[in-house]
Structure formats: structure tokens, C-alpha cells
Amino acid sequence: MATEMNELLTNGLDRAVELMVVAAHNSFRFGGRNTVKIARLTTEDQQEIAQFCYSLGDMSPLAARDGRFLMELIKEPCALMMFGDRRKSDLNFNCGACGYKTCAEMNRAEEVESLTARGPSCQFKAINLNIAAGAAASMAWRLGLYCRVFSTLGFASFALNKMENVDMAVTVSVSVAKNDPYFDRHQYWTDEHWKETFNKEFPTFTRGFIGAIEQE
């Protein structure tokens, strides 16, 4: 008996996610140490993340928008991958990018916890984390999947403790929907509301070079 299209799509998505993990696992790492954790979140996890993001409407309208979007996305075959890592450095680069003179000094600093991550954190660990996510997204694109990296869903998955022993996280969402769902999320807002919200959350995007005056 012939295999139904939906089953083929679901099975293909599962195999694609496995290849995305391989690509992320084998991606470049500063320091040559592979400390990034990777997990595929369940549909129930995604529902919880979507509701959490949507609840942040007053604090972060963009997170609320992405939560509403995820609620619609999971109605079709899709997957959400979570990437996480610890904040402390074992690299001993002593580059100062974290704001401390040495890695040891940063590692000894008092931990600060927020909704989105724990800090202070090694910038190279954060770069490694995003390189892994980018490698997974690149593999998804090569396999013909629709894909997008989400920081909003990442910090929501972190806040909800979807992965143990990590201090920062990012997510990669992939879909086999008929049309690309990731770059048409403005359907929930009018153009005026989008501009107002974007200027509120990212005021530096409305500024030019140093010395420019902010829009009133």
C-alpha cells in the first residue's frame, strides 16, 4: 500500500531534524570544545512555550507575537530544536569581551539571573551557541525545509527549564508547511502597530551614527 503524503512529510521532517543535529554537532567551535546541548522539544513543550510568550504581551509585544505565531505553526508538521550552553568560560582567552579582564575573573563574578538568560557570560560561548544553531538552520535550508532561528522562543524555553544545566538558549524552528510561514508574521498587526512596537523595543534602529538624535 502506498504511503500517505502526511506520513511521508512527518517521517522526512524527523530525518531532517536528525541531520540538523549532526550539522550543529560538527560545526566550528572556538576553543575546539563541543559543549553545546541540543534537544528537540515536544509538541506539548511548544504549546507551553507559545502560551508563555503570549503572556508577555505587556513586557515584550514581539515575544507575544511569536507566541501567537507558534500556536498556529504547530497545527502543521513542524519541529522546534533547542540549543543551550553554560555561561562560564573554560577557554582562557582573556579577551575582555565580557567586561572582565580575565576569564577567571568573569567566572568568579556574582551570577545574575534574568528572564532571558544568566550572566555574565563568555561571549565566545554565546558565539559557539549561535554557530551551532546557524549550522542546523543551514542544513534545514539545504534539505528544502522552511526554517527560522528564534531568540524569543529560545529565552522562553530557557525560562521554562526545558533543558537542564544551561545558562543561555536559542531555538531553531523548521516546518514543512505548504508556504513559508516564518516571514509573514506581520499578519497579526497593522503596519502602524508594527512600526510603533519595533521603535519601542529597538530604539537604536531609529538612530544613525554616534551623535544622532532619537526620534520623538
Where are the predicted features?
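Acidic, surface-exposed loops and disordered segments
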Residues: M1-E216
